[in-house]
Swiss-Prot record:
InterPro entries: UPF0767. Belongs to the SMIM12 family. One of its GO terms (cellular component) is membrane. This is Small integral membrane protein 12. The chain crosses the membrane at residues 12-34. The keyword Transmembrane helix applies. Signal peptide: none annotated. Keywords: Membrane, Transmembrane, Transmembrane helix. It is found in: Membrane. The gene is smim12. It is a single-pass membrane protein.
Amino acid sequence: MWPVLWAAARTYAPYITFPVAFVVGAVGYQLEWFIRGTPEQPVEELSILEKREERTLQETMGKDVTQVLSLKEKLEFTPKAVLNRNRQEKS
């Protein structure tokens, strides 16, 4: 009798195992969801872009944006380019 049962179990194992595993998985999923409870809603944080915009707005609030350097003043402080090394300095 046992060899017949083992042969039947071996033959029909995929048809028996999948529904059993499905039921066990579904019960475990529902049990875990019940034990954990409903998840708390996370507090919405500002994105990196929004933080950057807020920071730049705070920085520009105290400055007069109409007072900018002219191009000539900016050029005085630029570093010398590699190709300009052999040129003579203006004195």
